[in-house]
Amino acid sequence: MTNLKNLRGMVDLLPAQSQGWQKVESIALEHFSRAGLQEIRTPIIEQTELFSRGIGENTDVVGKEMYSFDDRGGRSCTLRPEGTASVARSIVQHGLLNKGPQRLWYRGPMFRYERPQAGRQRQFHQIGVEFVGLASVISDAEVISIAWNFLKDVGLNELTLEINSLGSNEDRNIFKEELKDWLNQRFDLLDEDSQKRINVNPLRILDSKNNSTKELLSEAPSLIDFLSNESKTRFDYLQELLVNLKIPYEINYNLVRGLDYYSHTAFEITSDHLGSQATVCGGGRYDGLISELGGPQAPSIGWAIGMERLIILAGDKILQSKSPDVYVIHKGKKAEQLALEITCQLRSSNLIIELDYSGSSFSKQFKRADKSRAKWALVIGEDEVSKGQLLMKKLRDKQKDEESREYIFSKSDLDQLIKKLIAEKK
């Protein structure tokens, strides 16, 4: 019989890692709540047309990477490859902009058929932020600061913020024609992928990872030289705001992002510790997406962070699981019942309690308690039950005297024990 395994690029999140993910998500919830953001959750499966219209038919995501299929009703459906288009669709469908600008965040799995590698899987997870209905450059700076400070809250320090201006649609159209002419004159010097992109999506060539093409592009026309005065003013003001916020940045004139809906501000936060997959966070302004999907004209800006890459960068510190406050050891039928009762009482006070279910000897249960890294062991045997007493033994700080590591108390004193344990946690 064939052993069933997960599909390539679809990774199980095991208990040893899940607590680290929960910690990151709890930091996100607290951080975004302080920023006045509200969470939105959208379906994993959407109509394929949403992404072909929203992301762009000529992008790599739509052309090569989407998981698309026809359902039993003959409708073309796609596992979402990113979150912004789904959020935009939901805003339009439910008329959320009738209530004013929307400041939203989301989280969840996304799907792209790519070659799996560290930090890039076919099912991957994102946390993202979207400001919809806000045109001000101040909103650009705030969105970037939320990403920057969130990553700092998670414990990431060695990061680089890269910014660029993609200008308006008019700016880009003029630049595209100039760039295409320049590239066509050097067609034979380009790598194969770039040759295919010249007439389809020439801006993506600026982001080529091919070394010879990158060297050639150092002499290419720059989008910054084709920006209107209005676009230049926006970009200059963004830089001024970032300086005021004490957020260091670098200008990367070849930063274009991979999706067609971006305009004006584009940015990435990168790390040198991720190898070729250096981008931790990417985003930008998308002023035409909402109207493209049938909604009103609604200037917007947002970003997404890849959870897998964030967890890799955070390292062992974020993955450390929380140790129990108390490991409950028991032996005997009556002791078992009392152990369950007290475990539930302690948990109701927000203490982390692990109850032993093995029924093995006290010595083996103590070994498991030590392995759990619990601070205390609560010991309940038949003798303790008959005497109406409970025994607490300190499992850590073993350098202290034995007497200070052991406490005997009655069940009626449980409230005092709870207060003691809570005080220790603070």
UniProtKB/Swiss-Prot annotation:
Keyword entries, A-Z: Aminoacyl-tRNA synthetase, ATP-binding, Cytoplasm, Ligase, Nucleotide-binding, Protein biosynthesis
A GO MF term: ATP binding
Enzyme Commission numbers on file: 6.1.1.21
Localization in the cell: Cytoplasm
PROSITE patterns in the record: AA_TRNA_LIGASE_II
A Pfam family recorded for this sequence: tRNA-synt_His
Stored Gene3D superfamilies: Anticodon-binding domain (3.40.50.800), Bira Bifunctional Protein, Domain 2 (3.30.930.10)
Domain of life assignment: Bacteria
CDD domains: HisRS-like_core, HisRS_anticodon
Matching SUPFAM superfamilies: Class II aaRS ABD-related, Class II aaRS and biotin synthetases
Root EC class: ligase
Catalytic activity: tRNA(His) + L-histidine + ATP = L-histidyl-tRNA(His) + AMP + diphosphate + H(+)
Recorded GO CC terms: cytoplasm
GO BP field: histidyl-tRNA aminoacylation
Family recorded in the similarity comment: Belongs to the class-II aminoacyl-tRNA synthetase family.
Matching PANTHER family: HISTIDINE--TRNA LIGASE, MITOCHONDRIAL-RELATED, HISTIDYL-TRNA SYNTHETASE
Binding partners and assembly: Homodimer.
UniProt xrefs under HAMAP family: His_tRNA_synth (MF_00127)
Name of the protein in question: Histidine--tRNA ligase
